[in-house]
Each structure stands twice: as C-alpha cells, then as structure tokens.
Amino acid sequence: RSLRRQRQMCIRDRYMTGGIVVVLGKTGLNFAAGMSGGIAYVLDEDGTFKNRCNLAMVELEPVPEEDDLLESEHHHGGDFEHHGRVDISSDMTRYDEERLRNIISRHLKFTQSDLAKKILDEWDNFRPKFLKVMPTEYRRALEEIKAEKLNNIVAAE
C-alpha cells in the first residue's frame, strides 16, 4: 500500500499542459516531469520540494506578497474580499498571491479542510512556504503574447 501511494505521489503533475493546481500535501519524486503548461503552487513546509522536482522544463519561484501591486493597480490593497473584480486569469505571470488564496478559499468552502482553514488563518506565515512551479517555455510564450498586445495597443494610439 505504501509503495502504491508513493507511485501515486510521483505521477502528480507529470505531463501537465495547462490549468492551475495547488498541492497542499507531499509530492513524490520527479514532480513536473514533462510539464509544458499551466501553473502549480506547492506548499513546501519543510523546504525540500526542490529535491523532488524535475527542473528540466520548469522554474521554481516564491509567491510574492502582492498587497502593493493590488493597491496600485486596483485599489484593493489588504482587501481580498473586495467588491470590485480583478481578472487574475488575464496574466498568469502575476497575481499569484490572490489566485492562490482564492483557490484555497474555494477548497475550504467545498471541503471544510482543516489544513486550508489553518493556511488562510495564518496566511502571513504560510504564503512564504508556497512555491510557484512554471514551465520556462510557457512563461516565454505568455510574455511574448503580453508584449504583442502592448505593441498593438501602442500602435492603435
């Protein structure tokens, strides 16, 4: 049974091509092998995730605190329950903190997970323990699309 569980853990997020996944539990070896798209946010409480992640196609980065970004762009600093809308799906290279917190909040709503509740209650302690896993080619493609849109806007003016 334990070997079976380890195998299940090992295959998580292999060959991921899109979407968003949040991992609150342990990962197995070779996480992200063949991951060409999408984003994974992994809770790395013990700081050992990098040793289990296949870094051939992905980069790991921290989930930054975004209060200043949200305040300057949307006037929503410190307010995750704001009444206005921020389209966090419009730019997958930004808004990580808000996106992650929203997903965990939905997880809590639908599952009553004790861990999700603890993470949200102690957000300032848990946020720095999350890593964003993003394929390098996916990031490059998103940056090219963003630059092209910006060029089209400038050209239209």
Region locations from a protein language model:
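Single conserved hydrophobic/aromatic residue that forms the stacking wall/gate
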Residues: 1-13
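A short linear-motif detector with a strong N-terminal bias
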Residues: 1-3, 18-22, 109-111
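Feature marks extracellular polysaccharide-active and adherence modules
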Residues: 8, 15, 24-26, 43
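Tandem-repeat/low-complexity and Cys-motif detector
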Residues: 12-13, 30-33
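Short "repeat-start/strand-capping" segments in structured domains, especially the N-termini
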Residues: 16-21, 34-40
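Intrinsically disordered, low-complexity terminal regions
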Residues: 29, 36-157
